Amino acid sequence: DVDETHTLGHXFXEL
C-alpha cells in the first residue's frame, strides 16, 4: 500500500 502514502502527500500538497 505504498500508493496510498503518495496519494496523501499529493493531496496535501495540492491543497
Curated annotation (Swiss-Prot):
UniProt entry keywords in alphabetical sequence: Lipid-binding, Metal-binding, Secreted
Highest taxon, organism lineage: Eukaryota
One function term, GO molecular function aspect: lipid binding
This protein's record includes keyword Secreted: yes
Spans through the membrane: none
Miscellaneous field: In the red-eared slider turtle, there are two forms of albumin, ALB-1 and ALB-2.
Major localization listed first in the record, in broad terms: secreted
Family from the record: Belongs to the ALB/AFP/VDB family.
Task performed by this protein: Serum albumin, the main protein of plasma, has a good binding capacity for water, Ca(2+), Na(+), K(+), fatty acids, hormones, bilirubin and drugs. Its main function is the regulation of the colloidal osmotic pressure of blood.
Expression by tissue: Plasma.
Cellular location(s): Secreted
Organism phylogeny: Eukaryota, Metazoa, Chordata, Craniata, Vertebrata
GO cellular component, one term: extracellular region
Protein name per Swiss-Prot or TrEMBL: 68 kDa serum albumin
